[in-house]
Amino acid sequence: MTNIWWVRRDLRLTDNAALQVALEAGPVVPVFILDPAFSGSSLRRKDFLYEGLHAFDRDLRARGSYLVIRKGNTVQALGELLWETDSETIYSEEDFTPYAIKRDEEVARHLSLNLIHGQTAHHPNSILKANGTPYIVYTPYSKAWKANLPSRLTPAPAPEKIDTPVRIRSEPLPRYKVSPLFPSGEQEALTRLDEFLHRQIFSYSEDRNRMDLEGTSTLSPYLHFGMLGLRQAIHAARQAMIQARGEMPKRSAEVWLNELIWREFYIQILFHFPHVSQTAFNASLANIEWINDESQFEAWKAGRTGVPIVDAAMRQLREIGWMHNRARMIVASYLVKDLLIDWRWGEAWFMENLLDGDLAANNSGWQWTAGTGTDAAPYFRIFNPVLQSIKFDPNGNYIRRWVPELRQLDSKVIHAPWEHGLKAKGYPDRPLVERDKERTLLAYQQSKQRMERV
């Protein structure tokens, strides 16, 4: 009996549990539905997905299959495909975002949908405290996560052949514009993983925060769309820990593994507490009186704040759809703590522009910096962007790359040219605001006091 393999955020053939189960049941029809909900994403992000669909189709055709494209209402599109192919069951990888859960519940009310766990190493319901409630602090969660991880987590290889009925009606694959810095698809993801394992992973703990170095994996867009499975990355990290020569390389590989666990931690937070997608996890900080100056927000988005490290990061985002993780923390702290602009404004801008715009990771990252989330940075921790710049871009090379107006400045002054009385043509003379830590702390403390009175 032919079955439908409904592909969503699992654009890979390697270690795809939903595909494996579907193939055991018989021939499969791989289908991707162009969801109207994705229409609000940036053109760059759409291009990354669409290029990934082309690459996925090529990988399928190399195995005797092909990707069917449908668009419109999900229930209607899947129902029509079931009827056209005389299929009975839809197999798909389980997704844990509030939107995906609601969508899948609607499909399951009308059609036979079999959701297969494969997006994470542990299902969000499987790692719980002794009293049956979810963890909200990372450290005990990570300990339980590691304790319950199988000793062997070898990824399943891609199938050599996929049997698919011929001549099934399909919409044309969407056109796309190639990104030279982030080519899309599973093969590119595997290549990047291999390069990372042979180069940066063993110095990851020292280099990962340096914005001027290529010290990170840059795998986040591929993990988001499932071109690389999280289980594959976890297996690679564990293998690197085994193969590492010396304590420091081993520690670096473990630090990367911990970052992957953070990703899974945030997925389960969103799963158990879906309200965080709309408001603060910490209710006592849900009523901060933000200033929300729109002109300052526009300057932040455009990379025109007058703070070089902030502007470099925001221009990197606009130009390539990606930003170094340390830079994300710096620009988020500046928006929320220095400009007193609602973290949700920044979160939405990131989701619109990031190739790796992942609701769980993005929301939790913003709430961590704002101090409003679970296991977040204390609300009174306020990054000094100049000190962050000096520490993590010591020679100013990251700034020079993305803020060409400052390219000629010496490394000693490039981080804060206004402090040295320097001006650069076409660049703001001074930052948008003078740093006022007391103003920020007062806004947060007043929110806590209002909640205490309630």
Explain the meaning of each model-derived region:
Residues T74-E88, A108-I116, E160-L173, G373-F380, ...:
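Short secondary-structure transition/capping segments
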